[in-house]
Swiss-Prot record:
Single GO MF descriptor: ATP binding
Name of this chain's protein: ABC transporter G family member 11
PANTHER family, A to Z: ATP-BINDING CASSETTE TRANSPORTER
Localization in the cell: Membrane
GO cellular component, one term: membrane
Chain ranges of the ABC transporter domain: 125-373, 808-1052
Record keywords: ATP-binding, Membrane, Nucleotide-binding, Repeat, Transmembrane, Transmembrane helix, Transport
Assigned protein family: Belongs to the ABC transporter superfamily. ABCG family. PDR (TC 3.A.1.205) subfamily.
Transmembrane segments annotated in the record for this chain: 482-502, 518-538, 567-587, 592-612, 627-647, 737-757, 1147-1167, 1181-1201, 1220-1240, 1259-1279, 1286-1306, 1416-1436
Keyword Transmembrane helix assigned: yes
InterPro entries noted in UniProt: AAA+_ATPase, ABC2_TM, ABC_trans_N, ABC_transporter-like_ATP-bd, ABCG_dom, ABCG_PDR_1, ABCG_PDR_2, P-loop_NTPase
ABC transmembrane type-2 domain ranges (all copies): 478-718, 1144-1369
Highest rank taxon of the organism: Eukaryota
Length: 1442
């Protein structure tokens, strides 16, 4: 945590080679000065604490009081001293690396997967030439030798692809993603292999932020602290006091004290700002108490002042706590750079410099490179590897290194290289003598809690981890109150629907069968609710992977906590359903039976939840998991014992009932209900009718139920269970226990799956390309060609670019949002303009409102109230404003199924003017690819970071910019275009934007951490303070003199020649974590003469714009560039390509259809013409209906995911809502036809339906099934279109599915459906028309011939002489079925078969074969209605909430 890493009583030898050497070698870094500087820093915080403390409520007083006493340096030193005095040890673990080579998969090792991939795999399998072909590889890092002593800080610099992130991951011992890792890595003398057991001691913090969005900052950090509270705390220090102390310390360090009770949020949930979320990520990493920390671009999203504050904090912690710190920053100012001790420069995987930061610049200048004035040292160090950026001194032409291999050779021939090797050797010898690993190992063991194993990788015991995770999981559920309440509301509604359908069932033959349906439906209901948990397993994977690497907890502990959390919430769900359903069903009014009912349903729900989670943990894709779960549901439902009695099951699948949760739950619930329950069949005993009412006939009537003796008109439920279902009521307890055993079994399986299966990439992204399009990796010749392409593109920029912009002005812009308790003003009377030929920078500290202002100016805001005026060329903004403006947003939202080139071409085709030819558009795309240094990525899949397949974070940012540039916008808004980019890429981007401005494009660009070189490209600046108030708007001036003179005029110290003006003004205005200023800058601006000049200039510019830029002559403004037909065609082509490239989704549905078809077909194998087989035909169709309904769950995520990309495209006016809505439906149809046809061929003939069907019936079966599948898919899409997210969809869909399958006429015959529901729901249910159409189709030509076991055989009074005489009245009363003469125990008898043909069966349901094609038309009508609903709700939700 803090104190257990520390120590200041260093060995004398360590002092000589360690700290003292650092002071002498690096005069620009002084530990004492750093400490003194932090004293001032602490005092500033104390002042802020007192200022804000007056406004804090009682709940947060503790945080403020701790903050007032906060002194970081003193805290660390005192904590360390007290820790050592109480018997603690030091964890001083430096890192030494020799000859490190990391090998990764080559770009051509894998290609973009699509529907042809399986066939290509088969060709490779049977082609001998592929058998010996090795997978291509390349060196991500090549022969790197470096080291970092404890207490030192090493900065790793390099361009994208240089290997910086890989070096950090390898140092953090995260090597699973690579083909091989060669070389020697030791940690304080411990080899890397042995050091693996100390997980969490070396940590890697990636640049992206992964947190649970619904937790607050306090809950996030308090949980991490609970998992990392050491056992060797100070005397009398409780766990609670320790956590409070560290919590307040870290929040104060990073300036998020006042955000402690704010939820973290994400791109969809409002919470912390991007910068605040980044500080939380840093804080959480510090809680891990690692001795070796690797920070990968941890300042991304922070302003320059906050980034510097962060670096200083890390510096002081490294000095006082002897932490080993290695960090990689894409953009680092000189201030940050000088905080570090050493710098390692990488290029194409090769180390081209490693040594003191103070000598790096001079080293490269000695090679013949020159540095521009005011250019920061980090920019210079990475810039020398870029042919377009580096400057060669006179006389060195042709003598400087060109390729990465040249640079590496020059480095290894240098004196500094030899000095560093010698220093590393001496450090390793020192480690060998002092053996710091002994103290380290002892300290790790002592830090483990007393209840934990001493050799455990984790600080706290397994039980402690589980308790902490349980509390966190409860917080996750309770913080999402809307989701929780909506789920329980759904349960209540569904409970009433189920209960009313099976309301007050009678104890007769009809009630006998409906009781089974009611009980099975209760099991199915809870199973459907459990399906949603499978999707949730995919959303927290990156957080789990991060916490696992930090050694916070075992993944299996997380699963146990989830299970414990499930129990109360699932119990509430089951109880709410049961209290309604049980008593309205009319089940036995017995308290014991009621609680057994609840207890069994609870076990079944928990077991199903564990089963579906197991699929989620085992499968890499949600679509694979969903398809597998659908097959299992069909299997479980079929072999539950209801649709097919056990005696009727075929041997090849009957084994499944022994491992079926549904079977045991159903058997237990049936035994619970039927034991001791009396049934009567007097009304339905055969024969019946007015002629048989006398008691003298009772002895000659028989219940239509197998096994009951003639004359017995009453029977026990136990008898029915035993004779008909082959269930034993005495096995109820055993079945309940088995249900819970399955739950425990799947819980254990999930624990093992979470421990040993990891589908995340660990932050590593692997690129995949189109087949045959992969470039060579880290190849010298390829490097030279790429440099030549970029050089040519740069030189031709002026000839290619030509923009026709205008003057854009804004005045008195105010933006207000509603917050609890009132309103909040986020922008306060902002004024300004942009015009051709000028670049305007928008700057301010984190939370100042920069992004908010851009959203308002770009007309992207959909929430809140915007006031003020915006004009383009003196006129009001027209409908085409969003299309003719480019907005590079901070979030990089791209469709992962496309390649980089395809994404750019799509933007160019739909946003450039229709008069521009396709050839010209594509030519411009290629030029932008070259300019953005993405030519080699053109055929690379964009992919996602979560899967680890696709382009990197930095490359996504470049793509975001490229997508806007290829549209040739007239105005360009850029929100953090260089965030996450290295210095050289940032330089190229800003240089490119400068060219756009010079070509006539007006633009404004927010920027957090501009170097002085980048800052010089801007002409004007709009500087904002917190609260959205203007600090300054005006010219920057030559060498920033105009800007700096404004601040100097208000009493700020002069800006030096070597200082970065951007950092200077942020410091002056009090930006940063703990920055403050004595000047009220917004008030100063209001009183300044510059503001008066601005007002006059605005009026003049509006008039100038109206005169200079005449109104368009080509007709009214168009919202979209292309016609609706063209948009639809292009959107459909794109979606079709995405579907083609998702074999998990497409082939998953095919395989699901095949498996379900085979399972159902062989389950109902070769059906005959008996009456029992008639029922089997009905359940065959019911299973097919369930397959269609389960498809709903599969298609919903696709629409919700694609809709997010649509919203981003719609905001930029790529295309309208109609093309997307119609395309997302149509793109599914061909795949549905294939899936339905596969199911048809796998099931129709195996079930023997062809024997009673002609060609027309066979075609009808296929056709109506395909149409029904169309309905199901479109229904799922319509529901998804209504819902705001997947969670809400998974809550709503079970409620709607209830109406589909319960009211279709199978679970309950139409005549038995309550009048209320039968009057409207039954007739509005598409499944009812599907069942009527397809059942009448397959039964209309079936002739029933009852088998002996299906025949009801009864004797008759001898006075009637013949069976015909005795049953004549019965046959006239009930015309269906037939009676024939039989014998019973050697006596003459009657045999009654309930049906003589299939037509008699469906006529009892009120169905007719004459309605078959009418039903097809009705289902098509429902399909069209669903499409209209998709279109409507895509339209209503086309604008995201922002």
């Amino acid at each position: 945590m803090v104190h257990n890493n520390d120590g200041d009583n260093n060995d004398q030898e360590m002092q000589e080679i360690g700290i003292n050497e650092k002071r002498s070698q690096f005069p620009h870094i002084s530990v004492e000065e750093s400490r003194q500087e932090f004293d001032s820093f602490s005092n500033n915080i104390e002042g802020e604490s007192k200022q804000f403390g007056m406004n804090r409520d009682a709940e947060s007083n503790m945080a403020v009081e701790s903050e007032e006493d906060f002194k970081l340096r003193k805290y660390f030193e005192n904590s360390n001293r007290m820790h050592l005095e109480n018997g603690g040890n030091e964890k001083k673990m430096g890192v030494s690396i020799r000859n490190l080579t990391v090998v990764g998969l080559g770009a051509d090792a894998s290609v973009i997967a699509d529907m042809s991939t399986p066939f290509y795999g088969l060709v490779k399998l049977f082609t001998p030439s592929f058998w010996t072909k090795k997978t291509s590889t390349f060196d991500i890092l090549h022969d790197v030798t470096t080291f970092c002593k404890d207490g030192e800080m090493v900065l790793v610099l390099g361009r994208p692809g240089a290997g910086c992130s890989t070096l950090l991951r390898v140092i953090a011992n995260q090597t699973a993603s690579y083909v091989s890792v060669k070389g020697d890595i030791t940690y304080g003398g411990i080899p890397s292999k042995e050091f693996e057991k100390y997980r969490g001691e070396p940590i890697y913090t990636p640049e992206e932020d992964s947190h649970h969005p619904t937790l607050t900052v306090r809950e996030t950090l308090d949980f991490a602290l609970k998992c990392k509270t050491p056992g060797n705390r100070l005397p009398d220090e409780t766990k609670r006091s320790f956590r409070d102390k560290v919590f307040n310390l870290l929040l104060s360090m990073f300036g998020i004290v006042h955000q402690a009770d704010t939820i973290v949020g994400n791109e969809f949930i409002r919470g912390l700002s991007g910068g605040e979320r980044k500080r939380l990520t840093i804080t959480e990493a510090m809680v891990s108490s690692a001795s070796i920390t690797c920070w990968d671009c941890s300042t991304r999203g922070l302003d320059a002042a906050s980034a510097f504050d962060y670096a200083k904090s890390i510096r002081i912690m490294s000095d006082t706590l002897h932490k080993t710190t290695i960090a990689s920053f894409y953009q680092a100012s000189d201030s940050i750079y000088n905080v570090f001790d050493k710098v390692c420069v990488l290029e194409k995987g090769r180390c081209i410099y490693f040594g003191p930061v103070g000598m790096a610049k001079q080293y490269f200048m000695s090679l013949g490179f020159d540095c521009e004035p005011r250019k920061s040292t980090p920019d210079f160090l990475t810039g020398v590897t870029n042919p377009q950026e580096r400057i060669i001194k006179k006389g060195f032409e042709g003598r400087t290194p060109e390729t990465s291999a040249d640079f590496e050779e020059a480095w290894k021939n240098s004196d500094i290289y030899r000095d560093q090797l010698q220093e590393q050797k001496e450090y390793e010898e020192l480690i060998e003598r002092t053996q710091p690993k002994v103290a380290f190992v002892q300290e790790v063991r002592d830090a483990n809690s007393k209840t934990n194993f001493k050799k455990s990788q984790y600080t706290t015991s397994f039980v402690t981890q589980v308790i902490a995770l349980i509390k966190r999981n409860f917080a996750l559920v309770l913080n999402d109150k809307f989701g929780m309440y909506s789920k329980y509301l759904s349960v209540l509604i569904q409970g009433f629907v189920y209960a009313s359908l099976f309301y007050n069932m009678d104890t007769d033959i009809t009630g006998l069968f409906t009781r089974g349906g009611a009980i099975l439906s209760a099991v199915i209901f809870n199973a459907f609710l459990s399906i949603g948990e499978m999707a949730m397993t995919f959303y927290g994977r990156r957080v789990l992977q991060k916490h696992k690497s930090y050694a916070l907890y075992r993944p299996s502990a997380l699963h146990i906590a989830q299970v414990v959390t499930d129990i109360p919430f699932t119990a509430i769900q089951v109880f709410l359903f049961s209290i309604i359903a049980y008593f309205m069903f009319g089940l036995q009014y017995d308290a014991g039976k009621f609680f057994i009912f609840c207890f069994t349903l609870l076990g079944a729900s928990l077991a199903c939840t564990a089963l579906f989670r197991c699929f989620g943990y085992l499968c890499p894709s949600m679509y694979i998991a969903q398809n597998i779960s659908n097959v299992f549901i069909i299997f479980m439902l079929t072999y539950s014992g209801y649709t097919i009695p056990i005696p009727k099951m075929h041997p090849w699948f009957s084994w499944f009932r022994h491992i079926n949760i549904f079977t045991y739950a159903f058997k237990a619930l049936m035994a619970n209900e039927f034991e001791g329950l009396d049934f009567n069949c007097k009304e339905s005993a055969i024969p019946y009718g007015p002629a048989y009412q006398g008691s003298e006939f009772d002895a000659y009537r028989i219940c239509p139920l197998g096994g009951i003796e003639q004359g017995s008109l009453y029977f026990k439920g136990d008898f029915y269970m035993d004779k008909t279902l082959s269930f034993a009521t005495g096995e109820m307890s055993q079945n309940v226990i088995i249900v819970y055993c399955w739950w425990v079994f799947f819980v254990v399986c999930n624990m093992f799956a979470m421990e040993y299966i990891d589908h995340t990439s660990g932050g590593y992204t692997h690129k995949v390309y189109k087949k045959g399009k992969a470039p060579k990796m880290n190849d010298v010749e390829e490097e030279k060609q790429q440099n030549a392409i970029v050089a040519k593109a740069t030189s031709n920029m002026k000839d290619t670019l030509h923009m026709d912009g205008g003057i854009f002005t804004w005045q008195n812009i105010r933006y207000t949002v509603k917050v609890p308790g009132g309103e909040r003003l986020l922008l306060d009377n902002i004024e300004g303009w942009i015009k051709p030929g000028q670049m305007t920078a928008l700057m301010g500290s984190s939370g100042a409102g920069k992004t908010t202002l851009l959203d308002v100016l770009a007309k992207r805001k959909t929430l809140g109230v915007v006031e003020g005026d915006s004009h383009l060329n003196g006129r009001e903004l027209e409908i085409d404003f969003e299309r003719i403006t480019g907005y590079v947003e901070q979030m990089d939202v791209h469709n992962p199924g496309l390649t980089v080139r395809e994404a750019l071409r799509f933007s160019a085709k739909l946003r450039q003017e229709p008069e521009v030819s396709l050839e010209e558009k594509f030519k411009y795309v290629e030029h932008v690819l070259e300019m953005m240094e993405m030519k080699h990525l053109g055929d690379a899949l964009i992919g996602t970071l979560e899967t680890g397949v696709g382009i990197s974070v930095e490359e996504r940012k470049r793509l975001t910019i490229g997508v806007e540039l290829v549209a040739k916008p007239q105005i360009l808004f850029l929100d953090e275009p260089t965030s996450g980019l290295d210095a050289q890429s940032s330089y190229n981007i800003i240089k490119f934007i400068r060219k756009l401005a010079d070509a006539g494009m007006p633009l404004v660009c927010t920027i957090h951490q501009p170097s002085s070189v980048l800052f010089e490209h801007f002409d004007r600046i709009l500087l904002l303070a917190k609260g959205g108030k203007t600090v300054y708007f005006g010219d920057i001036g030559e060498k920033s003199k105009t800007l700096t003179s404004y601040f100097e005029r208000h009493g700020v110290r002069p800006c030096t020649e070597s200082e970065n003006p951007a950092e200077y003004i942020l410091e002056a205005t009090g930006a940063g974590v703990h920055g403050k200023s004595d000047v009220n800058w917004p008030e100063a601006w209001k009183q300044s003469p510059e503001l008066a000049d601005i007002s006059r200039e605005l009026a003049a510019l509006k008039e100038q714009g109206a005169q200079q830029y005449k109104p368009r002559s080509d007709g009214p403004a168009r919202e979209f560039s292309q016609s609706t037909w063209y948009q639809t065609k292009e959107v459909y082509k794109r979606l079709n390509l995405i579907w083609w490239r998702d074999p998990y989704y497409t082939y998953g549905s095919f395989v699901q259809a095949a498996l379900c078809g085979l399972i159902i077909g062989f389950t109902f194998w070769n059906l005959q013409g008996s009456s029992s087989d008639m029922n089997q035909r009905i359940f065959f169709i019911f299973e097919a209906l369930m397959l269609g309904i389960l498809l709903i769950f599969v298609v919903m995520p696709q629409l919700i995911i694609q809709r997010e990309y649509f919203k981003r495209d719609f905001a930029s006016k790529f295309y309208s809502w109609f093309p997307f809505a119609i395309s997302i439906v149509v793109v599914e149809l061909p795949f549905i036809v294939i899936s339905g046809t596969i199911f048809f061929f796998c099931s129709f003939w195996t079930a023997g339906l062809h024997k009673t069907s002609d060609d027309e019936q066979t075609f009808y079966f296929w056709f109506i099934f395909i149409i029904f599948m169309f309905f199901c898919v479109s229904f799922g899409q319509a529901v998804a279109a209504v819902c705001i997210n997947m969670f809400f969809a998974m809550t709503l869909i079970p409620l709607l599915i209830v109406f589909l399958f319960l009211f279709c006429g199978v679970m309950v015959p139409p005549s038995s459906i309550p009048t209320f529901w039968r009057g409207w729901v039954y007739h509005l249910n598409p499944c009812r028309y599907f069942m009527e159409g397809i059942i009448t189709n397959i039964l209309k030509t079936v002739r029933v011939e009852c088998s002996e076991e299906d025949m009801a055989i009864f004797t008759f009074p001898k006075s009637y002489n013949t069976c015909q005489n005795y049953t004549s009245a019965f046959q006239s009363y009930k015309p269906s079925g037939y009676v024939e003469s039989a014998t019973l125990n050697g006596e003459p008898a009657c045999g009654y078969c309930i049906y003589k043909n299939g037509e008699e069966y469906y006529e009892t349901l009120g169905w007719s074969a004459d309605n078959r094609w009418r039903n097809v038309g009705i289902i098509i009508g429902f399909f069209v209605f669903n499409i209209l609903m998709v279109i409507l709700f895509v339209y209503l939700t086309r604008k995201g909430s922002r």
